[in-house]
Amino acid sequence: MSALNSRTVEEVRKDYAKLLDPQEPLDSRMRELYRLKEDCLKTAAGVTVILETIDTTDSVLLQHELAYNAGQSGREEAVPELERILRTTSYDVVTRHEAAEALGAIGSPLALQVLEAHSDPTTEPEAPIRETCELALARIAMKETKGDAAVAPPSGCEFVSVDPSPAFSALYSSTDEPVPHTVEELEAVLLDTSGRTRLFRRYMAMFTLRNLATEAAVAALCRGLREDNVSALFRHEVAFVLGQLERPSSQPALIAALKDEEEAPMVRHEAAEALGAIADPATLPVLESYATHHEPIVRDSCVVALEMHKYWANFNGLAHQQQQEA
């Protein structure tokens, strides 16, 4: 075992005291989380400190990022605490949703009971949480029946996140559901809000389009963001995927989602973060104008997006300077 992976919880707490400090500004704590993610996310001590941080903040944005990264760790030790968060209705819906998604990402059968309970409309009133649990159950079932490879990113894929569903692949087959291949076929699945297409299958189309990463695929995803009218959870994931792709052509759809006062906050927040990831100076005015928004997760996401803008502007400026000096 490396020295890095053998650090104790106490050592990681000391190294990430700013992350655990409720008095630290949000942007500072977010930077510390990203640093921990690169440093020791997949260790028992790392995920313990991530989970301990959740109850040190009332920022839904930070809570949601912490729960997301707990899921990305793949550590089964995180399951009991994530289950507690999912069950606790005093947490914001976005935080609870992210705990459920994290349970699906970890993929442990230990979580099946709580996921089944919160996928039931008779016990869980919040649609985004029910839908997240539905996706998590489907992902765990696919992992159990088809193996780890069925839910893993394709070989050579640039996107290494553990997603709520896999993309379509040769490992996915069904006599009832043919595998879509073209952008047009994938878009038809993505945009099917009739109820005939399971949400998990729509997600599979989404991640397949992301992996294709063509302009036509991006355009289809933008349509999904703005044309879907049945699932805020789905639209928020499309915005996240567009942030991963970082294509300027997606900015009009993302800006429209951020500005839409009728849109769910969870969607608007992901749209803001996606704009931050793209880091086009042209979007600075809209992010600045929503950085004082009355909805906390929208406001905080715009603040973080502006920090991302600043980082990439400095990074690109340094790279340009080095090219000039070479």
Curated annotation (Swiss-Prot):
<dbReference type="GO" id="GO:0005506">
    <property type="term" value="F:iron ion binding"/>
</dbReference>
<feature type="repeat" description="HEAT-like PBS-type 4">
    <location>
        <begin position="234"/>
        <end position="260"/>
    </location>
</feature>
<dbReference type="GO" id="GO:0008612">
    <property type="term" value="P:peptidyl-lysine modification to peptidyl-hypusine"/>
</dbReference>
<feature type="binding site">
    <location>
        <position position="269"/>
    </location>
    <ligand>
        <name>Fe cation 1</name>
    </ligand>
</feature>
<feature type="repeat" description="HEAT-like PBS-type 5">
    <location>
        <begin position="267"/>
        <end position="293"/>
    </location>
</feature>
<keyword id="KW-0503">Monooxygenase</keyword>
<keyword id="KW-0677">Repeat</keyword>
<dbReference type="InterPro" id="IPR016024">
    <property type="entry name" value="ARM-type_fold"/>
</dbReference>
<feature type="repeat" description="HEAT-like PBS-type 2">
    <location>
        <begin position="95"/>
        <end position="124"/>
    </location>
</feature>
<dbReference type="Pfam" id="PF03130">
    <property type="entry name" value="HEAT_PBS"/>
</dbReference>
<feature type="repeat" description="HEAT-like PBS-type 3">
    <location>
        <begin position="201"/>
        <end position="227"/>
    </location>
</feature>
<feature type="repeat" description="HEAT-like PBS-type 1">
    <location>
        <begin position="62"/>
        <end position="88"/>
    </location>
</feature>
<keyword id="KW-0479">Metal-binding</keyword>
<feature type="binding site">
    <location>
        <position position="270"/>
    </location>
    <ligand>
        <name>Fe cation 1</name>
    </ligand>
</feature>
<dbReference type="Pfam" id="PF13646">
    <property type="entry name" value="HEAT_2"/>
</dbReference>
<feature type="binding site">
    <location>
        <position position="98"/>
    </location>
    <ligand>
        <name>Fe cation 2</name>
    </ligand>
</feature>
<protein>
    <recommendedName>
        <fullName>Deoxyhypusine hydroxylase</fullName>
        <ecNumber>1.14.99.29</ecNumber>
    </recommendedName>
</protein>
<comment type="similarity">
    <text>Belongs to the deoxyhypusine hydroxylase family.</text>
</comment>
<feature type="binding site">
    <location>
        <position position="97"/>
    </location>
    <ligand>
        <name>Fe cation 2</name>
    </ligand>
</feature>
<dbReference type="InterPro" id="IPR004155">
    <property type="entry name" value="PBS_lyase_HEAT"/>
</dbReference>
<comment type="pathway">
    <text>Protein modification; eIF5A hypusination.</text>
</comment>
<feature type="binding site">
    <location>
        <position position="64"/>
    </location>
    <ligand>
        <name>Fe cation 1</name>
    </ligand>
</feature>
<keyword id="KW-0386">Hypusine biosynthesis</keyword>
<comment type="function">
    <text>Catalyzes the hydroxylation of the N(6)-(4-aminobutyl)-L-lysine intermediate produced by deoxyhypusine synthase/DHPS on a critical lysine of the eukaryotic translation initiation factor 5A/eIF-5A. This is the second step of the post-translational modification of that lysine into an unusual amino acid residue named hypusine. Hypusination is unique to mature eIF-5A factor and is essential for its function.</text>
</comment>
<dbReference type="InterPro" id="IPR021133">
    <property type="entry name" value="HEAT_type_2"/>
</dbReference>
<keyword id="KW-0560">Oxidoreductase</keyword>
<dbReference type="GO" id="GO:0019135">
    <property type="term" value="F:deoxyhypusine monooxygenase activity"/>
</dbReference>
<keyword id="KW-0408">Iron</keyword>
<feature type="binding site">
    <location>
        <position position="236"/>
    </location>
    <ligand>
        <name>Fe cation 2</name>
    </ligand>
</feature>
<feature type="region of interest" description="Required for enzyme activity">
    <location>
        <begin position="169"/>
        <end position="179"/>
    </location>
</feature>
<dbReference type="InterPro" id="IPR027517">
    <property type="entry name" value="Deoxyhypusine_hydroxylase"/>
</dbReference>
<dbReference type="GO" id="GO:0046516">
    <property type="term" value="P:hypusine metabolic process"/>
</dbReference>
<dbReference type="InterPro" id="IPR011989">
    <property type="entry name" value="ARM-like"/>
</dbReference>
